[in-house]
């Protein structure tokens, strides 16, 4: 009899929870319509994979790409709508969040054609790969719109779990297994540190979890200047530092970049930075509003360390992927300048603009590394010597992306850095901007060193990898080269006409 009553109570409780979830989805589902498109794409992929006897690979690519493009269209369709808070305060929709969601969707859309030939050559499981990419994209989008500490913790875990699985996708590779283990351990530790910081905010604010309500709670409890806030700030900064690969929390980054499949590295190198930057901006700007001087100082120190260590260690690398890993550590240091400046001197606008350029520059570089690796089986920097003599298109496009990463005019990277540094200078961050300028010069050195190798024509320097290099006979049918062309155009032309891009970015301030 007791068991029967307990069973009925369980059924009633489950029904109430289901009805509440259905009610929220029915009335608030329109606010996450782009995310719902991705969820539908995920379900469709699973259905086709489980019911089809003969795996039709083009359909999987088509469904994934179409879902991403439709999600982008849904975001653009509701552009400039009034900010809305939905799902009982857990999710916020505004232009600031949506532009970061757009950047994440753009990254994923470019990464899928970049991965096609690699997956076919390495015989990776296509369905699982696309499922992980779409799920990670979904987690990143929810993180951009998260409005409370619980969602901010859960959404990146959705992204991180897929990232761990993607980094260890080539199970037979010892380096991939090692990279996955390091990534998993460091990611778990950083999440624990982050949630510990949120627990301090929860207690100090009187039990609030929404970002704005945390501020109100701190005012009501008079704890906004207490030592506990400093403790929470330190823990949350360390947790975000791991997610952004800021020095000295960057130790996992080079090993994960080197050991993971190259298309996975291309995907993680941009999407994780975009999602974490959006989250960091909201966390520091809202709950820590009364501690702005403290978190400005912390981020300045981390940015300086990242720019110096990232660019100096990149000089000594012999692997292209490890070099780009340390380069990305330096690049995120530049992005931090925009977060510190804030919206007073167009700091957020310059940060968003530079991240848009960084996506094209970084993905363009990785597209060339994928293509070169498939045709030669190596990613050693010295093995690129003389590539121009065999494939001028690949060598020139790689050189353009590297020069744009270094910030040479008139490429997009130069104008992005110029505006970012100018905003920092106007905000009084003279020392930080000076370090940024000096380290940019250092980065140009190791990028030019690679370009010199690409253009060399001396036979004694050309390795057997380039001597035996074979180009694809059907250039128009190569999806990687399609991504390359898009990224080269985006790395060069937009820099000349930056004003429209900056104007759009300035409209995203929350």
Swiss-Prot record:
- Identify the Pfam families for this entry: Ndh2_N, Proton_antipo_M
Q: One GO CC annotation, please?
A: chloroplast thylakoid membrane
Q: Briefly, what is this protein's role?
A: NDH shuttles electrons from NAD(P)H:plastoquinone, via FMN and iron-sulfur (Fe-S) centers, to quinones in the photosynthetic chain and possibly in a chloroplast respiratory chain. The immediate electron acceptor for the enzyme in this species is believed to be plastoquinone. Couples the redox reaction to proton translocation, and thus conserves the redox energy in a proton gradient.
How does this chain assemble?
A: NDH is composed of at least 16 different subunits, 5 of which are encoded in the nucleus.
Coarsely, its chief localization is: plastid
Q: Which GO terms describe its molecular function?
A: NADH dehydrogenase (ubiquinone) activity; quinone binding
Topology of the protein relative to the lipid bilayer = Multi-pass membrane protein
The stretch of residues making up the signal peptide is none
- What family does the database annotate? Belongs to the complex I subunit 2 family.
- Where's it found, cell-wise? Plastid, Chloroplast thylakoid membrane
What HAMAP family does the entry give? Answer: NDH1_NuoN_1 (MF_00445)
- Designated name of the protein: NAD(P)H-quinone oxidoreductase subunit 2 A, chloroplastic
Alphabetical UniProt keywords: Chloroplast, Membrane, NAD, NADP, Plastid, Plastoquinone, Quinone, Thylakoid, Translocase, Transmembrane, Transmembrane helix, Transport
Q: Which GO terms describe its biological process?
A: ATP synthesis coupled electron transport; photosynthesis, light reaction
What are the transmembrane regions? 24-44, 59-79, 99-119, 124-144, 150-170, 184-204, 229-249, 295-315, 323-343, 354-374, 395-415, 418-438, 484-504
For this protein, the Enzyme Commission number is 7.1.1.-
Task: Give the catalytic activity.
Answer: a plastoquinone + NADH + (n+1) H(+)(in) = a plastoquinol + NAD(+) + n H(+)(out); a plastoquinone + NADPH + (n+1) H(+)(in) = a plastoquinol + NADP(+) + n H(+)(out)
């Amino acid at each position: 009899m007791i068991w029967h009553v307990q069973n009925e109570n369980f059924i009633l409780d489950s029904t109430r929870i289901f009805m509440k979830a259905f009610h929220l989805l029915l009335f608030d589902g329109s606010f996450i319509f782009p995310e719902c498109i991705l969820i539908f794409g995920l379900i469709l992929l699973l259905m086709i994979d489980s019911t089809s006897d003969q795996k039709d690979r083009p359909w999987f690519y088509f469904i994934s790409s179409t879902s991403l493009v439709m999600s982008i269209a849904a975001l653009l369709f509701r552009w400039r709508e009034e900010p809305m808070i939905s799902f009982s305060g857990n999710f916020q929709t505004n232009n600031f969040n949506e532009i970061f969601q757009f950047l994440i969707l753009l990254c994923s859309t470019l990464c899928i054609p970049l991965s096609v030939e690699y997956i076919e050559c390495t015989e990776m499981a296509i369905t699982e790969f696309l499922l992980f990419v779409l799920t990670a994209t979904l987690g990143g989008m929810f993180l951009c719109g998260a409005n409370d500490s619980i969602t901010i913790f859960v959404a990146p875990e959705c992204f991180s779990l897929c990232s761990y699985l993607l980094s260890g996708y080539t199970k037979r590779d010892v380096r991939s297994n090692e990279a996955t283990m390091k990534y998993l351990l460091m990611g778990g530790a950083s999440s624990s540190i982050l949630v510990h910081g949120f627990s301090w905010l929860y207690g100090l604010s009187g039990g609030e979890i929404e970002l704005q309500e945390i501020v109100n709670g701190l005012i009501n409890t008079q704890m906004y200047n207490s030592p506990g806030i400093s403790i929470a700030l330190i823990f949350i900064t360390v947790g975000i530092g791991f997610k952004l690969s800021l020095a000295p929390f960057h130790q996992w980054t080079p090993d994960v970049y080197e050991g993971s499949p190259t298309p996975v590295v291309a995907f993680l190198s941009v999407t994780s930075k975009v999602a974490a930057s959006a989250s960091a901006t909201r966390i520091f700007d809202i709950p820590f509003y009364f501690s702005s001087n403290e978190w400005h100082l912390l981020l300045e120190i981390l940015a300086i360390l990242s720019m110096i260590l990232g660019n100096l260690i990149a000089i000594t690398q012999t692997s292209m992927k490890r070099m780009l890993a340390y380069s990305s550590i330096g690049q995120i240091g530049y992005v931090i300048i925009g977060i510190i400046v804030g919206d007073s001197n167009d700091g957020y606008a310059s940060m968003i603009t530079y991240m848009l350029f960084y996506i094209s520059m970084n993905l363009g570089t990785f597209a060339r590394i994928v293509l070169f690796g498939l045709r030669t089986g190596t990613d050693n920097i010295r093995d690129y010597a003389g590539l121009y003599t065999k494939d001028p298109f690949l060598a020139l496009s790689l050189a353009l992306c590297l020069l744009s990463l270094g910030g040479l005019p008139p490429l997009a990277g130069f104008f992005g850095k110029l505006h970012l540094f100018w905003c920092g200078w106007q905000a009084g961050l003279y020392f930080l901007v000076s370090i940024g300028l000096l380290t940019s010069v250092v980065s140009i050195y190791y990028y030019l060193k690679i370009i010199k190798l690409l253009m060399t024509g001396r036979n004694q320097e050309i390795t057997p990898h380039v001597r035996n290099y074979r180009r694809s006979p059907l250039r128009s049918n190569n999806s990687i080269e399609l991504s390359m062309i898009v990224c080269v155009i985006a790395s060069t032309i937009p820099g000349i006409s930056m004003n429209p891009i900056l104007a759009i970015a300035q409209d995203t301030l929350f």
